[in-house]
Amino acid sequence: MAKKIQSYIKLQVSAGAANPSPPIGPALGQKGVNIMEFCKLFNKKTENIEKGLPIPVIITVYSDRSFTFITKTPPASVLLKKLSGIKKGSSKNKSEKIGKINRSQIKEIAIIKNNDMTGSNIENMMRSIEGTAKSMGLIIEG
């Protein structure tokens, strides 16, 4: 018989840097999950990813206090900032352009995010990422 699901916890945790401090500790502690076990497993799973990249994770907590988790790819905005070399998006995206990104870089992000996005093909995913880039104040070239 399948285990009974108690709850889901959604967090963004830096790759390879999970530790029991907030937000991980309080979120898992109130559900009775072994925090150190999660931190060890998460850090092991994300050891090949660039340290510091925020990784969305969905933790399924079962009624016997055991858990499983799924890691996703970093948010598109984080990948766009990394590839365009900017620190943060523009607060006035219509009038203030703060960086440039080309279509080949957008395609690279779409390929990385392929499993997490709900696009039927790469072109549709690229359009979605272009929208994110425009809202951040990036100019799309090519």
From Swiss-Prot:
Give me the gene this protein comes from: rplK
Q: Which InterPro entries match?
A: Ribosomal_uL11, Ribosomal_uL11_bac-typ, Ribosomal_uL11_C, Ribosomal_uL11_C_sf, Ribosomal_uL11_CS, Ribosomal_uL11_N, Ribosomal_uL11_N_sf
PANTHER family in alphabetical order: 60S RIBOSOMAL PROTEIN L12, LARGE RIBOSOMAL SUBUNIT PROTEIN UL11M
Q: List the PROSITE patterns.
A: RIBOSOMAL_L11
Identify the keywords attached in UniProt to this record, alphabetized.
Answer: Methylation, Ribonucleoprotein, Ribosomal protein, RNA-binding, rRNA-binding
The GO biological-process annotations, alphabetized, read as: translation
- Taxonomic classification, please? Bacteria, Pseudomonadati, Pseudomonadota, Gammaproteobacteria, Enterobacterales
Q: Which Pfam families match?
A: Ribosomal_L11, Ribosomal_L11_N
Q: Which SMART domains match?
A: RL11
Subunit record text: Part of the ribosomal stalk of the 50S ribosomal subunit. Interacts with L10 and the large rRNA to form the base of the stalk. L10 forms an elongated spine to which L12 dimers bind in a sequential fashion forming a multimeric L10(L12)X complex.
Q: What is this protein called?
A: Large ribosomal subunit protein uL11
Q: Which family does it belong to?
A: Belongs to the universal ribosomal protein uL11 family.
GO MF annotation: an example: large ribosomal subunit rRNA binding
Q: What does this protein do?
A: Forms part of the ribosomal stalk which helps the ribosome interact with GTP-bound translation factors.
Instruction: Look up keyword Ribonucleoprotein and say if it applies.
Output: yes
